[in-house]
Amino acid sequence: MEFTPISPPTRVAGGEEDSERGAAAWAVVEKEHMFEKVVTPSDVGKLNRLVIPKQHAERYFPLDAAAGAGGGGGGGGGGGGGKGLVLSFEDRTGKAWRFRYSYWNSSQSYVMTKGWSRFVKEKRLGAGDTVSFGRGLGDAARGRLFIDFRRRRQDAGSFMFPPTAAPPSHSHHHHQRHHPPLPSVPLCPWRDYTTAYGGGYGYGYGGGSTPASSRHVLFLRPQVPAAVVLKSVPVHVAATSAVQEAATTTRPKRVRLFGVNLDCPAAMDDDDDIAGAASRTAASSLLQLPSPSSSTSSSTAGKKMCSLDLGL
C-alpha cells in the first residue's frame, strides 16, 4: 500500500498571506467526514492523550503489528513498530500536525499521545469542544488526513429569579377574621415580540423600544379573595313578641254588667276573675245607692277599685 507524502505548506516572512492561501486550498479539497468526538476533561488534561472510540479506531486507523506499519482506510504519515503509528493531519489553515497513535493494553483503548498536548494548547481546546476527523477524496487528496474542531455551544442564558417572599399575614381580632398569605406570583422573563415588519417591540410598547434581555416583567394573576368568617351573635326574637304582648295587656278591658260599664285592670286576664270583680263591684255600688248623702263618698270609693259608668 502506497501513501502520498504530505508536504507542509511553506512559511514565508509574512506568514499571514500564506495562511490564507493554505486555508483556501484546504477548503477546495474534497473531503470525507470520518468521525468526531466531544473531548472530555481527561482528553484536555494532564494525561496528554486523546482516546479514540474503538469502533472508529479499528475502522479508520487499524494497527497491523505483523507488518510493522499501518494506515488502512487512509492513514497518512510515516509508520512505526509495535509502539504504534505516527499520523499526520492538516488543519483548516493548512498546518500539519503529527500525533503518535497506539493501543494501550492497560486501558484497552486507542489513543493519540505525542503531539496532542501541543494541539490542545494552540487551539485552546476545552472540555465540551468537538474534534472532527476527515480524509481526502479523489486522486489529488488521496491519503491526506484532516483535523478540525468547533467550540461547544454556549448554554442559553438562564434567567435567575430572586426568591419571592410571601407577604406577612395580618389578623384582625376585632372582626375575628384572618387573611391567609397570598401565593407567590410567578415571574416571567422579558420576551421580544417581533412584528410582521421584522421590528422587535416590547409587549405593550410602541416601535423603537428594544427590551434588554436582563429585564423582567411581572405578570400578576387575579387573586381569589379569601373567605371571611364573622362571629355569629345570637338574636333573641322573643323579646319583640314580649313587648308586643305587654302592650296589648296594658289596655283595660270594659265589661257591661247589670247595665253598668265596668273598666277592669289589665292584670285580670282570666274571665272568671273579671266576672267576680265586676259582681263584687256592682254589689258594693248597689248597697251604697239608698244613701243619698253617701253617694259622693261611694262614687269616690268606687273609682279606686274600678271606674263606674251608670247607665240608669
From Swiss-Prot:
InterPro entries: B3_DNA-bd, DNA-bd_pseudobarrel_sf, LEC2-like
Keyword list, A-Z: DNA-binding, Nucleus, Transcription, Transcription regulation
Start-end of DNA-binding region: 35-153
Cellular component annotations (GO), alphabetically ordered: nucleus
Keyword Transferase: no
Signal peptide: none
Gene3D superfamilies for the chain: DNA-binding pseudobarrel domain (2.40.330.10)
Membrane-spanning intervals of the chain: none
UniProt entry tagged with the keyword Nucleus: yes
Matches recorded under Pfam families: B3
Ranges annotated as biased composition (Low complexity): 286-301
Alphabetical list of PROSITE patterns matching this protein: B3 (PS50863)
SUPFAM superfamilies: DNA-binding pseudobarrel domain
Ranges of compositional bias, category Basic residues: 170-180
Cellular localisation: Nucleus
PANTHER family per the UniProt record, alphabetical: B3 DOMAIN-CONTAINING PROTEIN OS10G0537100-RELATED (PTHR31140:SF8), B3 DOMAIN-CONTAINING TRANSCRIPTION FACTOR ABI3 (PTHR31140)
UniProt protein name: Putative B3 domain-containing protein Os10g0537100
Biological source species: Oryza sativa subsp. japonica (Rice)
